[in-house]
Amino acid sequence: SFLDEGLLPAEIVNLTATITAFNAISDTRKESNKSIYTELEKIARVQSVKGSNAIEGIVTTDARIKQIVDGDSAPLNHDEREIAGYRDALDEIHSKHDQMSFSENMILHIHETMTSLAGYELSGKYKTEDNLIMEIDERGRRRVRFTPVSATETGEAMQQLVLAYMDARDNPKINKLLLIPCVILDFLCIHPFNDGNGRMSRLLTTLLLYRSGYVVGKYISLESKIAKNKNLYYKALEKCQHGWHDNKEDPSSFIKYLLKIILAAYRDFEDRINVVSNKMSALDIVRKAVESKIG
């Protein structure tokens, strides 16, 4: 596989090393910054629910999103039920990720949690009809951006996705962090659900990061960063989808994109901790750690 060939692009190696160094530092600081961590967690939760839904055009006012996320108000319409469902799925990942192994049953369970409040007919079930990934340009013209796996082949494709993940996860030559964007890319190319694939991909990203020991998504919203860079997200995705059906895709663009999002989250995390606690920046420590790892 791409990840096991041993000759990864230098940019990907650098990004991975820097993220790993930041992650190690964030772990050591939690005990002395508990109140800051708790506050960041509350903010990130609202931003994640807002950002991930906004990418799909599911919106309400900021005040309503906060009320729904905080559990202060029941959802009032379809969009708000979608938002509340995402909140429930994200909360479960934040609180129970150590019990949520990456499996078909777990993926279906997360989809059911995310969609059940909105009354999806196929909540927690794979698609029954073929779907297309469409794009609308600035003139309103529609084009097919990608043709996912057919409905009849989806069950088999998802089974293979999970098995491939388990094999790669247990391979000591493969960096667990690099595996995550590859899994998410495959998931988006399969597009296993009639609806909710984009939001599911972001929930699964958070789950897989947790299970690989990277907790930044709890304190800084990855979803809001993706929402702010939506065009870059779609460009990286489309570039990597070329040749996917023939196993000839090059996943490096999507790997770089997602690693940059994760690194930006860690940098934000570090900045916010420093602003409040006034401690020395970890950038020098990270640089030294990266240099020693690369050199």
Predicted regions located by residue number:
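FIC/Doc superfamily catalytic core
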Residues: S1-G295
